[in-house]
Amino acid sequence: MHCPFCRHDDSRVVDSRTTDDGSSIRRRRQCPNCSKRFSTVETASLSVIKRSGAPEPFSRAKIASGVRKACQGRPVSEDDIALLAHRVEEAVRAQGAAEIDAHQVGLATLPFLQELDEVAYLRFASVYQAFDSLADFESAIDRLRAQRAAVAVPPVEPVAARG
């Protein structure tokens, strides 16, 4: 790493810390030539391969924008959307690949959106899973109902009042 002050071609790492969101590393460095200190922020690059084949840097804002459209008119806050976009980015980065297909990013979004809002999930899924008929929607709704029934907890019977 070049020193920004004297352009010396080497520096020593004095301290390393992850950023608050854990997506990058902040390093405090010192130049052995001029002894001045400076900070760097290092982030692993992640490229999304578009349908056209062109790569583009991963954008959490694009995830949020797509989810925001699916959530339009739904009781979902901006904080919920931002958290979902962060979780999608974490899931995509956890795969360890430097490049990922745009369609895969959309599919990675689905489980988090299903957890957040089922109607928004159906809207989003209809695009990313290319629904082209009413039967596709019915099938997705049936899967949601089956998943809900599988995790449903029977209601607790009220305890009779003691006298």
From Swiss-Prot:
Question: Positions of the zinc fingers (unnamed)?
Answer: 3-34
The terms under GO molecular function for this entry are: ATP binding; DNA binding; zinc ion binding
Record's cofactor remark: Binds 1 zinc ion.
Cofactor requirements of the protein:
Zn(2+)
Q: Which Pfam families match?
A: ATP-cone, Zn_ribbon_NrdR
- An individual GO BP term: negative regulation of DNA-templated transcription
Taxonomy, superkingdom: Bacteria
Q: Where is the ATP-cone domain?
A: 46-136
Keywords recorded for this protein, A-Z: ATP-binding, DNA-binding, Metal-binding, Nucleotide-binding, Repressor, Transcription, Transcription regulation, Zinc, Zinc-finger
**Protein family according to the UniProt entry:** Belongs to the NrdR family.
What the protein does comes down to: Negatively regulates transcription of bacterial ribonucleotide reductase nrd genes and operons by binding to NrdR-boxes.
Q: Which protein are we looking at?
A: Transcriptional repressor NrdR
* Native species: Kineococcus radiotolerans (strain ATCC BAA-149 / DSM 14245 / SRS30216)
Q: Which gene encodes it?
A: nrdR
